[in-house]
Each structure stands twice: as C-alpha cells, then as structure tokens.
C-alpha cells in the first residue's frame, strides 16, 4: 500500500503469467496460520473447468492468469491487446469478456468475505482501461447484496515488476523504522 497510504486494507489481484494475490489488513499482508492466505489463484470458480497445475479443476488460475488468456486467445498478450483495442476481431472481445467475467465473479465473492478495496496489479494491469473497470463493476454489482464503487477498484502502476517492488519495500520499511 506504499502508493496508497490512505488504504488500511485491500484485496490484491496479481495478474501475472501465473495468477497471485494478497489480502492486506491493517497495512499488513495477512499471511494466515499456514502461510497461504491470499492464494486467490486456487479459488474454484468452476468445478467442471480446466485442469489446474495444482491438480484441481476450475481454479481462477485457469481463467485469469496471463498464461490462461494467451492460451484462450491463441496469441501473446502483447499482440492480443492492441488487436482487442482496435476492435479487429469479435473473437478477441469474447475472450476478454470471458476473462473479465471470471475475474468479476471472484471479486464479487471476495467482496462478501473481505470488505476492502480491490487492487488490480501485475503484468496485465497496464492493459486495463476505464471501460474494463466499468465492465467489472457492472458484473460485480449485479445482484450483489453489497456493491463496490468505482473508487474501490484501483489499478496498479508497476506492471510485471510489482512483486519485486513489493519485496524490496519490505526492506525499505525495515530500514526506515531503524533510522
């Protein structure tokens, strides 16, 4: 939350080659008693879905990682997004909507458990547009007992370097506290 000191808590979706996540409460990453808190990638979103590397089916990883998007679209991310934004193929729109639908499903469910803003971060974050955020919000809030406002979804600015920066900030914080 270095870039958002006003936030006390957040749910972080790290949209990298492999999906990752974090739960932040009271300005600290929640580790959990067995150190696996925030492993959003293995939340089941479809019990009959694709086989995940963990051995289960339908994990969010199989729908919302950058690898899953590339596999679905049949092309690298760096080719996919320019073609998508230029509206070159309705097929690409379908792949992106499917991606966003699964992401919104996970966000909607997590919002019921953890009442906190959502941070979209990682490799795919720079590709998100205002239109994508609006789409997510519509799908998160449809039929939801508790809705999210637009200012509760934040898009990270560090892209694929987010994990490295986050790891470094741990030591920066320790140094600052020691001074």
Where are these regions (language model features)?
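ATP-binding/phosphotransfer module of carbohydrate and carboxylate kinases, centering on a glycine-rich
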Residues: 2-4, 60-179
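Phosphate-binding/catalytic loop of phosphoryl-transfer enzymes
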Residues: 1-60, 67, 172-179
């Amino acid at each position: 939350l270095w870039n958002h000191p006003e936030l006390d808590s957040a749910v972080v979706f790290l949209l990298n080659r492999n999906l990752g996540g974090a739960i932040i409460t009271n300005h600290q990453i929640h580790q959990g008693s067995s150190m696996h808190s925030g492993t959003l990638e293995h939340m089941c979103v479809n019990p009959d879905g694709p086989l995940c590397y963990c051995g289960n089916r339908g994990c969010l990883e199989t729908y919302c990682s950058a690898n899953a998007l590339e596999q679905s679209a049949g092309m690298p991310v760096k080719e996919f997004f320019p073609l998508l934004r230029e509206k070159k193929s309705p097929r690409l729109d379908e792949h992106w909507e499917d991606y966003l639908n699964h992401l919104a499903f996970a966000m909607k469910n997590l919002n019921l458990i953890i009442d906190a803003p959502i941070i979209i971060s990682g490799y795919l974050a720079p590709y998100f547009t205002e239109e994508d955020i609006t789409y997510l919000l519509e799908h998160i809030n449809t039929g939801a007992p508790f809705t999210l406002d637009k200012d509760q979804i934040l898009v990270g600015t560090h892209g694929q370097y987010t994990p490295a920066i986050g790891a470094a900030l741990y030591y920066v914080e320790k140094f600052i506290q020691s001074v």
